[in-house]
Amino acid sequence: MTIMSDKWIKDAVIKQSMIRPFAEKQVRVHNKEKIISYGLSSYGYDARVSNEFKIFTNINSTTVDPKNFSEDNLVDREVDECIIPPNSFALGRTIEYFKIPRDVLVICVGKSTYARCGIIVNVTPLEPEWEGHVTLEFSNTTPLPAKIYANEGACQFLFLKSDQICDTSYAERQGKYMKQVGVTLPLT
C-alpha cells in the first residue's frame, strides 16, 4: 500500500467527490482568529468536527454495553465548544462527507494540538467504498475538563492505495455504518 499525496487527493475529490466540502489548502485563520487547522496537507486531509456532540454522562448510572447500547448514557449538545468532563468521552462527527474509492483504505490519526492537551481522537479505518460522515470518538484523558472546538480541525485522514482491488468492498457486504449521517451510535 502506498500513502497518497495532496495531488492524488485533489484529483480524487474532482473525479469522485471523495470529500465534500473540501478545503484545497490548510486553513489556519477564520474571521481574523487563529483556529485549529483543517484542509489538504502534503499526505492527508485534516477534517473538521461539526457542532453536533454526544457526551457521556453517569446521570442514569447505566452500563455501557456495545451490544445493547443505551442512549441514556449520553447527553446531546449542539455547541461551538464542547466541554468533555475529566476522564470522560464524547462523540462528534466530521463536517466532511467521505466517499472512499474501492482501492483505498483510510486511516485516521489525531491532531497534535489536541494530543498535547490529553485529548485523543479515535476512528476506525474507512474501508473501500464506504461513505458517510465519520463519527469521531474523543477521549479526555486528563483530570480536568477539556474543550473541543466545532468547525475546526479535529483529525487527519491518511489515504492508502492498494496494489490490488479487494474482492468484497464495505458497500458490497452492506456494512452497518454505510452512508451514516450525523453522530452514529454503536450498532450490532
From Swiss-Prot:
GO terms for molecular function: dCTP deaminase activity; nucleotide binding. It catalyses: dCTP + H2O + H(+) = dUTP + NH4(+). Pfam families: DCD. SUPFAM superfamilies: dUTPase-like. Its EC number is 3.5.4.13. DCTP binds at K111, S112, T113, Y114, A115, R116, T135, L136, E137, Q156, Y170, K179, Q180. It comes from the Bacteria. Disulfide bonds: none annotated. Keywords: Hydrolase, Nucleotide metabolism, Nucleotide-binding. It is an enzyme of class 3 (hydrolase). Pathway: Pyrimidine metabolism; dUMP biosynthesis; dUMP from dCTP (dUTP route): step 1/2. One of its GO terms (biological process) is dUTP biosynthetic process. The active site is at E137 (proton donor/acceptor). Catalyzes the deamination of dCTP to dUTP. Homotrimer. Belongs to the dCTP deaminase family. This is dCTP deaminase. It comes from Rickettsia typhi (strain ATCC VR-144 / Wilmington). The gene is dcd.
